[in-house]
Curated annotation (Swiss-Prot):
E.C. designation(s): 3.1.-.-
One Gene Ontology MF term: DNA endonuclease activity
Identification of the protein by name: CRISPR-associated endonuclease Cas1
Protein origin, superkingdom: Bacteria
Cofactor requirements of the protein: Mg(2+); Mn(2+)
Source organism per UniProt: Streptococcus thermophilus
InterPro entries: Cas1 (IPR050646), CRISPR-assoc_Cas1 (IPR002729), CRISPR-assoc_Cas1_C (IPR042206), CRISPR-assoc_Cas1_NMENI (IPR019855)
Keywords, alphabetical: Antiviral defense, DNA-binding, Endonuclease, Hydrolase, Magnesium, Manganese, Metal-binding, Nuclease
Effect of gene knockout: Plasmid transformation is still inhibited.
Binding site for Mn(2+): 149, 205, 220
Function: CRISPR (clustered regularly interspaced short palindromic repeat), is an adaptive immune system that provides protection against mobile genetic elements (viruses, transposable elements and conjugative plasmids). CRISPR clusters contain spacers, sequences complementary to antecedent mobile elements, and target invading nucleic acids. CRISPR clusters are transcribed and processed into CRISPR RNA (crRNA). Acts as a dsDNA endonuclease. Involved in the integration of spacer DNA into the CRISPR cassette.
Name of the encoding gene: cas1
Length: 289
């Protein structure tokens, strides 16, 4: 059974391994956490020493490890080369995915994202703008040749954060959005690898400098989870918003009629998307905020 705890380490310390436990040591105390309890390990400072045996065991247990830079921003995460015995078979399937199937799956995923943006604006009582995005949703075509996704995003972010807001601006709002999206991306990248796929080969994302094109495609409907937290805390500074973003690891969300932790939803959603792409009879899953 997968772990459930998100462990955040943000002070000078040493992390090591002993008898299936992560050992935390600093000048003041020593603590032990059984690996079976850990789902995510967030290393929020560069002032941490890890043993290679611990790293090896974290990979064995499929624990998501996120590394932060000297500004405490996520900069990398640990993923194994192969997370299942038949990864070569799955990679061969991935390379052979039919263009029309990729188009159908990608369009369904983006439709969910646009719909969730509309729903969230309605939740915030921006009913006119919500309806404008809903109209874009109803006019969405395969692979979105008219860029309705982009038009929706512009309406959405300008409604939430003001007409002068752009995603290129250097401010606390964008820093928080990027931080939250990176947390999401790391969760999806882990599940992509667990499914035996290469993270680099996406559906529509094809940036040669993006190592996580497929995870970037699949995570799209989940972005409004981050947007909601940032919007609710928009008057706070980045440090405060960042702390609130950690709630995505402990909150539950409605999925398939059940309240579930986000990591479990991400796992199920990703598996079903991959099965749909493999044409194994799985319907494209839905996620609604």
């Amino acid at each position: 059974m997968a772990g459930w705890r998100t462990v955040v380490v943000n002070i000078h310390s040493k992390l090591s391994y002993k008898n299936n436990h992560l050992i935390f040591r600093n000048s003041y105390k020593t603590e032990m956490i059984h690996l079976s309890e850990i789902d995510i390990l967030l290393l929020e400072t560069t002032d941490i020493v890890l043993t290679t045996m611990l790293v090896k065991r974290l990979v064995d247990e499929n624990i998501l490890v996120i590394f932060c830079d000297d500004k405490r921003l996520p900069t990398a995460f640990l993923t194994p080369y192969y997370a299942r015995h038949d990864s070569s078979l799955q990679i061969a399937r991935q390379i052979a995915w039919k263009e029309n199937v990729k188009c159908e799956v990608w369009t369904a995923i983006i439709a969910q994202k646009i719909l969730n943006q509309s729903y969230y604006l309605g939740e915030c009582s921006f009913f006119e703008k919500s309806q404008s995005i809903m109209e874009l949703y109803h006019g969405l075509e395969r692979f979105d040749p008219s860029n309705r996704e982009g038009h929706s995003a512009r309406i959405y972010f300008n409604t939430l954060f003001g007409n002068d807001f752009t995603r290129e601006s250097d401010n606390d709002i964008n820093a928080a959005l990027d931080y939250g999206y990176t947390l999401l991306l790391s969760m999806f990248a882990r599940e992509v690898v667990v499914c035996g796929c290469m993270t680099q080969i996406g559906l529509k994302h094809a940036n040669q400098f993006n190592q996580f094109n497929l995870a970037s495609d699949i995570m799209e409907p989940f972005r409004p989870i981050i947007d909601r937290i940032v919007y609710q805390n928009r008057h706070n500074n980045f440090v405060k918003i960042k702390k609130e973003l950690f709630s995505i690891f402990s909150e539950t969300y409605l999925y398939n009629g059940k309240e579930m932790y986000l990591s479990n939803i991400v796992s199920d959603y990703t598996k079903k998307v991959i099965k749909a792409l493999n044409q194994l009879g799985e319907e494209i899953p839905e996620f609604r905020i």
